[in-house]
Structure formats: C-alpha cells, structure tokens
C-alpha cells in the first residue's frame, strides 16, 4: 500500500508548477478538485483524507466520485470531464512513482469522458456592437 499524501504533494507542489509550468491558479483549481475527491473517498471508506492510499483511488471509486459531483453537487458534464482529466493527469504522474499501480491506473485511464452539448456562441447584433463602441 502506498500513501497518497506524498504523491499528491509532489504532484501539486513540484510537478505541476515546476516541471509542467502550470500557473498558481491552475494548481489551486486542481487542488480543490482533489480535495473534493479525497473528502468523498475518505467518507466512503470511513477514514480521514490523510490516511488514504493510492490503491483507494481505483476506477469504481473514481466513477462513484464523478457521479457524486454530478448528482449531489449539481455539476454539469463539462465540470465532470475537467475533474476526470485532472485525475488522469495525476495518475500519469503516479505511473512513474508507483509501478505496482499500473493496472489500477490503466483502469482509471479507461474511464470515458461524458458527452455533452456545447453551447453555441451568441453573436452580437450590429446595434449591440455600436452600443459597446459608443
């Protein structure tokens, strides 16, 4: 069993900002999403987030979390897909740190994004453009 805390710390404090060049705002957004995931997983497992192991974040747990943020938190499919993308990015990082978790990580990577309708961009009328420019 591999503790999750050192992995997420290395991911958020070193890998994302220093190696990948993510902005502080992006790192904060990722951190918030992981806080939601860890709180959800800890509640389901009856433990504290600080005691979670990487093995606890298997595909069924991730799928349950994605359902939770859609159904109970009221997030849409695009937010769900962003959370899933951040989890997959973290799992790519973990692949190099915990080779024994490769099968589990492969199952997480196999979770598909959810299709969703994209909103059409509304164009301004000439009258609206003139009002803005004047």
Can you say where each PLM-predicted feature lies in the sequence?
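N-terminal core-binding DNA-recognition domain of tyrosine recombinases/integrases
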Residues: 10-25, 31, 35-120
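Alpha-helix boundary recognition
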Residues: 17, 133-134
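Onset of an N-terminal alpha helix
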Residues: 2-9, 27
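DNA breakage-rejoining catalytic core of tyrosine-based enzymes
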Residues: 115-133
């Amino acid at each position: 069993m591999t503790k999750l805390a050192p992995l997420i710390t290395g991911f958020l404090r070193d890998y994302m900002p220093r190696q990948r060049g993510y902005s502080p705002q992006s790192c904060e957004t990722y951190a918030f999403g992981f806080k939601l995931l860890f709180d959800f997983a800890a509640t389901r497992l009856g433990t504290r987030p600080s005691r979670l192991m990487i093995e606890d974040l298997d595909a069924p747990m991730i799928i349950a979390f994605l359902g939770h943020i859609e159904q109970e938190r009221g997030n849409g499919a695009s937010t769900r897909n962003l959370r899933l993308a951040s989890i997959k990015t973290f799992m790519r990082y973990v692949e190099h740190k915990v080779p024994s978790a490769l099968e589990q990580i492969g199952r997480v990577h196999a979770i598909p994004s959810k299709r969703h309708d994209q909103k059409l961009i509304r164009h301004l009328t000439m009258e609206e453009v003139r009002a803005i420019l004047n």
